[in-house]
Amino acid sequence: MLTQNIMPRFSETDALGHINNNTYGVWFEAAREPIYKLFLPNLNIKKWCLVMAHSSNDFLKEVFWGEEVIVKTAVSKIGNSSFELKHAVYQKGVLCTSSKTVLIHY
């Protein structure tokens, strides 16, 4: 399991005062970088060999600016050319968001 600490930015909040739903995709992409490096250690975009086929999020609790979040990432399934990742966002030790992403290696 991979773990990444992220400090939410004020610009990631919305009018309701919590982190905007669009922000999670950015956080999950950052959390996937170590996995990308397994396929492309130098992250050379001209030799990129992964494509996202699916992504879904479940928003369980609000996340707020000013408190660090922990993003945990794990490989949950491996197929012939694809693999599934599970992401989880925790703030103050509470699971706030879970996500599933399917990447295809070509």
Task: Give the predicted meaning of each segment.
Residues 1-54:
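Hot-dog-fold acyl-thioester-processing enzymes
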Residues 1-4, 54, 59, 63-65, ...:
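HotDog/MaoC-like acyl-thioester-processing domains
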